[in-house]
Amino acid sequence: MSNDTTKEETSTEDKLSELIDSVSQEIRTMALIGDVTEEKSTDLIMGLLMLTDLSGNEPPYDPIKMYISTYGGSADEMFGIYDMMTKAKQQCEIHTVGIGKVMSAGTLILAAGTKGKRLIGKNCRVMIHSVNAGSVGEL
């Protein structure tokens, strides 16, 4: 692959990312679709920052709508998203909408929405379980 092709692909990816960021700011809608991972956590946290603190506008901001469909994932990343949502709710409402399935780590993210603004679809499955951990092997 030549450097020119790589530069063109990077430029196209950058333009697409900028377009998505711009549209996201206008419609104030985010989504967590799939597993809660470090990459998705980073995207959601940065999105929340862009729609609140970094937007350059003064609070109160228009509400943010967050769609969630996940089997769960990393508890550490979930708590990062939860903490940022808690901070963002000081400046605007966050409307959470469960679609399809909201399970495990996704349930706390769904519950982190503004009271009275948390919804699930008619056919959405929600599952929560106790947290446990363990280790195996010699110490």
Feature locations, PLM:
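Terminal-region recognition feature
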Residues: 1-139
